[in-house]
From Swiss-Prot:
InterPro entries to which the protein is assigned, alphabetical: UPF0216
Protein name per the record: UPF0216 protein MK1676
Provenance organism: Methanopyrus kandleri (strain AV19 / DSM 6324 / JCM 9639 / NBRC 100938)
Disulphide bridges, residue numbers: none
Taxonomic path: Archaea, Methanobacteriati, Methanobacteriota, Methanomada group, Methanopyri
Transmembrane segments: none
Similarity comment text for this entry: Belongs to the UPF0216 family.
Domain of life: Archaea
Length: 147
């Protein structure tokens, strides 16, 4: 295991700063549908509100038993490779349905090109958010530190 360089540490710190708009805790579709004004609290203390029509469309796409598993907002992970990644079984299922892609039961990750990302964001602007990933910073997987 090699030590991270100063540049790597700086870049990771900046990416974490850029991601302040992300929620402290994502909520399930089930939780959000019960709220009068569906929202999550972001890391920077602001609130991100969801459009109820988007939530209803997601509820129509996804079988009811998965409403408690779909975590929102769906995070569109942007990383070093230039591709976007969506993670999570329920999240991937929704994205595949929206994009007309084949979905497999065991699938918990999907890579998207930027045209697909644009379509997804146009369909669900409040139910999706960009996340800048540190996982493949500088073209290599992030090293997990154990303390």
């Amino acid at each position: 295991m090699r030590d991270e360089s100063r540049l790597d540490k700086y870049v990771i710190k900046e990416i974490l700063r850029i991601n302040r708009h992300l929620p402290r805790r994502r909520k399930t579709l089930e939780e959000l549908l019960r709220e009068e004004r569906p929202h999550v609290v972001n890391r920077d203390g602001t609130k991100h509100y969801f459009d109820r029509d988007e939530l209803e469309r997601l509820a129509d796409i996804l079988p009811r038993y998965l409403h408690g598993r779909l975590k929102l907002p769906i995070l569109i992970e942007l990383g070093y490779s230039g591709a976007a990644v969506i993670r999570g079984k329920a999240e991937v299922r929704v994205v595949c349905e929206v994009l007309g892609e084949e979905w497999r039961f065991s699938q918990d990750r999907v890579e998207l090109n930027m045209l697909d990302v644009r379509k997804l964001r146009r369909e669900f602007p409040t139910a999706t958010q960009y996340m800048f990933s540190t996982e493949y910073i500088m073209g290599r997987p992030k090293v997990e530190r154990r303390g």
